[in-house]
Amino acid sequence: PLAFGGLALLDRLLAGASARQRLGRGFVVGLALFIPTISWITQLTFPGYLVATLVFAVFLGVVALAVPPHDGRRVALVGAWVLGESLRSAWPFGGVPLSLLAVGQVAGPLATVARVGGVLLIGLATVAVGTALSALFTAERRAAAVALGAAVLLLVLSIVAPQGDPTGETIDIAYVQGGGPQGTR
């Protein structure tokens, strides 16, 4: 999926960048991520869409700022991204888990990782693959092997992890979705 290439590009953008550059580049990547993926908010409120897009883009800028430009950059990018997604899933308003990396892996190769560690572990594995691609482009084969190995290990663990047994019990669930006029326009 495109997430791997996008994260490899983000890693390259952060390499050797000053704090101001990392913040700015993270912000621009945030705009590129959130402008299309939360555009549905315009159906509710266009000003709210603009505010949400800017707030989440700044959030990603801060994540990029937390990543050091040299030593440990790739490991820090993985950790900062997962921390950022975790915080976005809890704040503001009790959590706004929009545009998480796991959404792009629903039918992707890392989807089974959710059984072991949920959406955050999918995010971790996705960023690890992205940083592995980045390392390959710069001929850092050892770093690429470590990052890709970590992602593959998570994938293998998720495949061999126990799935549980059906209990034979059933429950009835009711789900109601509104769809009438809401006075939002």
PLM segments and residue spans:
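Membrane-embedded alpha-helical bundles of multi-pass enzymes
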Residues: 1-164, 183
